[in-house]
Structures are given as C-alpha cells and as structure tokens.
Amino acid sequence: MSQAQIDEIFALLDSAAKVLIDQGVLPADWQNNSQITRSKSPEHGDYASNIALTAAKAAKSNPRALAEQLTAALPANDSIAKLEIAGPGFINIFLNTDAKFAVLDAIFAKNQKYGLTDEFANKKIQVEFVSANPTSSLHVGHGRGAAFGMSVANLLEAVGYEVTREYYVNDAGRQMDILATSTYLRYLQLNGEQIHFPVGGYQGDYVTDIAQTIKTQQNDAYVHSYADISANAPEDEVSEVNDAGEKEVVSGDKNAHIDVIIANSKQALGDNYAVFLNAALSEILGDIKDDLNEFGVRFERWFSEKSIADEIEPVLAELDSKGHLYEKDGNIWFRSTDFGDEKDRVVRRANGLTTYFASDIAYHKNKFERGFDTVINVWGADHHGYIARVRAALTALGIDEKRLEVILVQFVALWRGEEKIQMSSRSGKFVTLRELREEVGNDAARFYYVARKPEVHIDFDLELAKSQSKDNAVYYIQYAHARVCSVLEKLAAKGFDVDDAQGSAQQHLLTADAESELIKLLAAYPATLKRAATGYDPHVLTNYLKDLASLFHAWYNDNRILPVSIIADETPSQEELDMMQARLRLSKAVRQVLANGLSLLGLSAPTSM
C-alpha cells in the first residue's frame, strides 16, 4: 500500500477522533494506536481501519456505534469515495479512481527509486556478516549468511541508513596456526618426509596445493626432519566406529598433539613460519573474496583481527579498573555473570595468552568507537551461546548493549537425491558455495537462502531450484518480468509504441478486480520494504514478490494485453488501443516493481527466459 495514502487516511481518522475528544466522547489523553491495512477483497474497499475497535474501551462505547460517530466527523477529502462500517466496527475505505491510480504515477516518476525513502537518513549502521575463518573455501552454510547479510544491508540502505558492510577476518589465533602447520606438514611430505598428518589438521587437497606452490618457489629451503617437528608430541587421537555407526575416541588427544606440532614448527622455522601462514591466508582469503564477489556480495571493509592486537590490553585494563576481572586457577576471568551471562569467561589463560573472547571484546568496542548507531552481527546458529558474553562485555564497558543486534542464521541442509551431504572443513569433505552456485546459479541461491526467516532451517532442494515451473518461486518471479518485456518486444515488432500519455489518460479503464488488486499490491511495495528493512527480514520481500508475480500471471492469462487485431496485422479499433495502453501501463508498473525488488535481493531481472 502507498505510505502516503496510509498517512493521509490515518490523519483524517485522527482528525475525526479529535472532534470526538472535543465533544467529550473520547478522553483528552487518548492516544491513537490504530492501524490501516490493505483490504483483502475489493468488496471490502481499498483499506480498513480498526480505530473504532481500539478506541471503544476509552470511549465506553460499542465499536460499531463509535465507528458511526467517527465517519460522521471525518473531514471531507477528494481521495475517499465512500466509507463502510463492517463486522464488529471496522471502517472500510473506498478510494476515488484518481487516488487509486496515483501509485502508477509514483512508480513512473521514481522508476528504480520507487519504494526508497530517506526516513532513516543520518543513521549509521554496520552489518558484519559471513566472517568465516580464512582456513578453507566457503561452504553452503556460509552462503546463507552471505545472502542474508547482503540483503539486509541493501534493505537498510533502501530506507535511508548509511550502511557499512564488514567482514571480520580471523587472521590471528589458533585456527591460523593449525592451517599454517597443516600446510607445513604437507610441504614436508612433498619433500619426501614420512609424516603422520594430525587428526586435528586441515585435510583438504587445497592445503597440499598451497604447499606445492611454496615447494615450487623455495624447493627444500624450509625442510626440517619430521622427527624434530613431532618431538614430544603426545599420542594423536585414535578413533573407531562403534556398533551404532558413530565415531568413538579410543585413545589420544588431537588438540594436545597438534599444539605440540605447532610449537615445534614455530621453533624450527623461526621467522620463516610466516611464509606458510601468509601463503595459506593469502590464497584462501583471496578465494573467499573472489567467491563472494562472483555471488554479488560486497563489503566496504575487510577488518583484520591482527589490526586490533594493540587494543586488547587496553580494553582488559579498562575492565580490570572497573572491577570486572579476577584471577582464578592462574587464569584471568571476566565477571560475565554480573551482567546476565550463565558463567564467567576466561580472557587470559594461565600461559599469558589472551583468548578469542578478549579479541572480540576489543573488536566490538572498536565498532562502537567508529560511530555506528547500531551494530548488526549476522552469526551462525552455533554462536547462540556467545551472545550473552558479548552483551555483558559491552555493558561492562558502558556501551548500551541494545545497540547491538545479533541475528542467528540457521543451518542449511543440502540434499542430492536421497543423500544428505555432511560438511566438515577439517576433513575437506564439504560442498562449497561455488559448487552450489555453479549447479543452481546465483539467482536461485540468493533467493532461496533468504526465502525463509533466518531462524528457520533450510532444506535446499537442488532440483526445485533448477526447475522452470511455477513451483520454483524465483523462476516464476523472473518470468513475470520477462513476460512484460516479451509483450513490449511483440508490440514494437508490429510497429506500435507504448504511449505513456495515452496509458495514463486511459488507466481508468482498469476496473477489473484483478487490476484493482494489482494496483493495491503495487502501492504496498514501499511499506513492504520498510517492514523488511526494520525487521531485518528479507523473506518479507521474497513473499511480496511471489504474491505480485502470481497475481500478475493470473491477470495476464485472463486478459489480452495486445489485441487480436494487432497480432493478426489488422487495424485495431480506438477502444482496443485505449485498453491496450492502459494495460501496458499497468504491466510496465509491475515490471518496474519486480525489478526493484529483485535488485535489492541481489537477483537479476531477465528480459527473456
């Protein structure tokens, strides 16, 4: 629905309510919390208001009787044709013809900007999303976070926010050491060393490929005996499959084992350890950037964890000065339970090293120091337990934790026939985002990733995503856009042009119920965008586009846009031309809104299919 129309109707009814306040029917302190909604069927008008129902208690009156008084007190307005009272006291509003078609004028006046507002201009918001460890290629689960985060950012920009999209690069810490050491062990193997590759290492072929590049460039310059690298390492994890078909640890400790391998590698290589870390980071992060760029996902900033290394100690000192840290068992703990967390959290281990959580405290403090009014973290559902400790840290630092929004994105289950693909980046057995995109295309992936609420699991149906039928929502939406383009091509091929002035002059001919419903749905687009943006919920827009495409296809199938006479190369009557131009105007409006919505979701609007 048109926000301008809603605001106008709300103001008119509010004026009527003020008349009743002056008459003593409503108390002076009554607040108008009513809603204007789009009517579901033409016989109930264009819009409906529940003002009489919400005000009845304050007026100590029957809602229908109060509705009669409100409609009687309503100021005269050229946009409203009539009012009807329905049911328990709803007020149905019927618009005049000119008011109905105002939305078409708005669409053609604004084109790609139709639906956009500056309501939240001068508000700065950061959306941090994906932020996958640069230890392997992105998998299909990361893809959902990418599509969701980008769509949310686009929607926020559509309503005026100044948005910064950010990827937090975890380029420091233990996972990077595991990656660097995994690469070094493969390098030793390529140079003829007999090694045991750790259970806790990164097993994918990409690690060997990186090691091969280093070997090609440096030959055996960094070789040390595996005996030295594995010296004093405790037994690695040994497991077997039990009777239930589950892997069961029999002996050993994979974490303790690889930690010694890492320490020995660092000692043996010295400064050259960075050769393996940097080579792996550069290769994998470059692949991630390329993958996301191909997916249409961009970031204003790639924020390195290393860049805040000097900010960790000051933030811990600040927490300590406020009495929020204490020592226990050699570790330094943050009193997270004082701020609602389920348990206190270690920020410095007994060995003197700070934890990942300590880095995250510094990172979040850094975010708010950059002046964002709101910070949105798009995290995987497995980070649920992490939210409370981050909010606790912000509160302890004197930052309003309500300025942090955390959106958890549930997992994606990918099905290929009867087989559910399991994913594990350490084992190297996972379906990458790139593989998914190559199979179903960017558009299908982007759409189905956001077609459900983020807290809902997705079972990604590959066959449906590739099908060309109305069951495939993204195909059906794009086909509606292409259908309009096809009509315009046929029109031009017959030697006729779209006459915008004539279409505007004849739009009063669009009196069919389906045409009225299409126009009302087009008018609802701006409000839909606002609801999707402020609710951080792109699936509101996907549902809207499905509804618009479905309604258009039904109307198109029942109504001929190009007259039979034109198709048959005969001279059309003036009546046929008038109706054609009116329907072309409506079709073009639908095409524009479909294109606008698809663009915000990062999808293409094809001209042919």
From Swiss-Prot:
Q: Does the keyword Chloroplast apply?
A: no
Superkingdom is: Bacteria
Q: List the disulfide bonds.
A: none
Q: Where is this motif: 'HIGH' region?
A: 132-142
Per the record's keyword annotation, is Nucleotide-binding included, yes or no? yes
Per the record, what are the reactions this protein catalyses? tRNA(Arg) + L-arginine + ATP = L-arginyl-tRNA(Arg) + AMP + diphosphate
- Signal peptide boundaries: none
Cellular compartment(s):
Cytoplasm
- Which UniProt keywords are given for this protein, alphabetically ordered? Aminoacyl-tRNA synthetase, ATP-binding, Cytoplasm, Ligase, Nucleotide-binding, Protein biosynthesis
Q: What is its EC number?
A: 6.1.1.19
CDD domains in the cross-refs = ArgRS_core (cd00671)
One example of the protein's molecular function in GO is: ATP binding
Family assignment from sequence similarity:
Belongs to the class-I aminoacyl-tRNA synthetase family.
Subunit structure comment from the entry: Monomer.
**Protein's name according to its UniProt entry:** Arginine--tRNA ligase
Its lineage reads: Bacteria, Pseudomonadati, Pseudomonadota, Gammaproteobacteria, Moraxellales
Identify the coding gene: argS
